[in-house]
Amino acid sequence: MRGLLLAALPALATAAALAVAAPHGSALAEEEEGFSFLGLDLKGSLGEGRHSRYVPPLTNPIFNETPYITTEIRPFYFYHVIPDDFVTDGGHANLFALQARIALTERLAFIATKDGYADIHFDDVLPDEDGFANIALGFKYAFYSDPESESIATAGLRYEIPIGDLEAGGIELQGNGDGFLNPFVTGATTFGDLGLQASVGANLALDTNEDTSIVHYSVHADYEVLPGLFPLIELNGFTAIDNAERSTGALGQLDGVDVFNFGSENRDTTVTIGGGLRYRFNDHVMFGAGGETPITDKDNTVMDYRIYFDLVLTL
């Protein structure tokens, strides 16, 4: 499966090269006709006669998928702090990941949105751990696209392959079970300088004894206060719909939020709020930075707060 990502590198390298060479401040609506590679419409939703505004969400990067069809690579990093009330008396994690998206047509895209390397440090109880996360691949299709009103709606399906190797104190954090199917719907629209986006989906465990199935949901709002500068605010939620049997007792209430799945028998709901900004250097390069923290009880979640940084390189 890693070969699929490697096969995408020629198109993604082209996107990165164009991003570096692009003139500062040009408008997406003034782009040339859609760039074609091997007969693919790599411009996707963006370009002349198509959508002219693209501000992807920042927090919940694994589940809150943009509805726009793009060819891009998106390296991201987050610093994750574990609450002091957690069974380990706190700790922190660093996650480095790379997302890839390839527009096959104006409405259809291949997406690879979960991977990465995690370095986890616990303050007590569990040993420190580092290793690779699972990989999630799939496709999405824009079933509604109206550039005139800057509105778009997209449905997609991802499969999370359980090939990660994260384990702490005998608790498998990644690489357990048979993976997940993740159907989702996402949409966006704009009102002048205001951009709105929302998504909902279900991360369905294929081995329901080992992993917990959840519903995830997100809303995003951004506003262009200066040319290319977009402050944003986001709300994300994660609710168990089918608990597993792998973690019981004190561990049975643990909520791994988006990256980790403890297979808990009594996982609760976590809702987070996030904020930050994006800055668009030109039509092909956008930077993002922000933070996120739960607004629900932190007693049984592994998240106290997160700090995010990413770079969106779009063809």
Predicted regions and their residues:
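Transmembrane beta-barrel domains of Gram-negative outer membranes and organellar outer membranes
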Residues: 28-207, 214-315
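Cleavable N-terminal export/targeting peptides
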Residues: 1-43
